[in-house]
């Protein structure tokens, strides 16, 4: 058996649900209840959330052979352009991940990514040798202070492995950052710059409270904060600016990008779309349909772009 995100299951024809936007990546979850204890995660060791939850998404179980067969058909139709494995740190998780990578690669010609916590560089090498296109590290926190509070573990060791992997395997390493864990905006922007300088792909997420987790009563970030971080990521990732160009308050809030043609740069709306690996649009991973859109899963209309620019509330 294997867990499949609800949206992916609908694209595969395994579930009959109505979707506003379909995922362009097939998302599969491996592992089970995690030995790690991230305060925000539904799969954390102390979490009381449903075992079928990750963020606000439900991941029902399906027969693995059937899932791989319908994945192949979805790839042939052009509905799915990438497969991403969401892996929890459970018993046997690493070998299980290698097995599924090889099974997917042996079934269809689709790039496979893995959001996983490798133990060391040897495991990074094994994942890439098995056929992984990108390894996604869930750094999540923008600095040691927040990392220790919401994730625990060794910040320096975690960052060192990410940076070493990026240097050794350029173009094959991604990092996930969550806005809204208690960090300052300046900390997020500085980590984005640090990761970009090493060539990492940066996927930005908005904190989403999940019932049953230790952070269930914490509010999501203000949309203005998230928009500023989206713009910062977009400018840095596209080498249009560096964090040193930005102006921050003494409290660490981003006040100005100091980039005169900013409205023109942002006019296509791409800055506000889901960021991360190619073809990863994660529909409604951080949002409820009809609610506030943190990450747009498809190109924005001109009206949506105009609204998003107004939402980030900085001097432009």
Residue ranges and their predicted role:
Residues 33-36, 62, 66, 95, ...:
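Conserved active-site and cofactor/substrate-binding residues in soluble primary-metabolism enzymes
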Residues 162-186, 207, 212, 218:
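Conserved strand-turn element in the central/C-terminal portion of the radical SAM core barrel
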């Amino acid at each position: 058996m294997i867990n499949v995100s609800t949206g992916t299951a609908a694209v595969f024809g395994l579930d009959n649900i109505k979707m506003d936007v379909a995922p362009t990546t097939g998302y599969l979850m491996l592992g089970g209840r995690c030995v790690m204890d991230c305060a925000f995660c539904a799969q954390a060791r102390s979490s009381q959330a449903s075992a079928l939850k990750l963020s606000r998404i439900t991941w029902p179980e399906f027969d693995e052979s059937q899932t791989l067969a319908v994945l192949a058909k979805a790839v042939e139709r052009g509905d799915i352009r990438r497969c991403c494995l969401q892996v929890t740190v459970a018993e046997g998780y690493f070998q299980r991940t290698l097995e599924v990578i090889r099974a997917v690669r042996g079934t269809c010609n689709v790039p496979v990514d893995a959001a996983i916590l490798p133990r060391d560089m040897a495991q990074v090498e094994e994942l890439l040798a098995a056929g992984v296109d990108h390894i996604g590290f869930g750094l999540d926190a923008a600095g040691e202070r927040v990392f220790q509070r919401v994730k625990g573990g060794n910040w320096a060791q975690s960052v060192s492995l990410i940076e070493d992997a990026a240097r050794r395997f350029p173009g094959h390493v991604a990092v996930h950052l969550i806005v809204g864990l208690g960090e300052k905006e300046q900390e997020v922007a500085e980590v984005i710059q640090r990761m970009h300088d090493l060539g990492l792909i940066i996927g930005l997420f908005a904190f989403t409270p999940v019932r049953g987790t230790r952070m269930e009563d914490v509010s999501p970030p203000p949309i203005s904060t998230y928009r500023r971080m989206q713009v910062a990521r977009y400018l840095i990732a596209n080498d249009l600016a560096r964090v040193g160009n930005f102006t921050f308050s003494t409290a660490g809030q981003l006040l100005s990008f100091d980039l005169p043609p900013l409205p023109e740069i942002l006019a296509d709306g791409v800055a506000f779309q889901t960021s991360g690996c190619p073809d990863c649009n994660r529909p409604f991973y951080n949002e409820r349909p009809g609610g506030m859109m943190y990450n747009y899963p498809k190109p924005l209309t001109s009206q949506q772009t105009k609204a998003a620019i107004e939402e980030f509330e900085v001097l432009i």
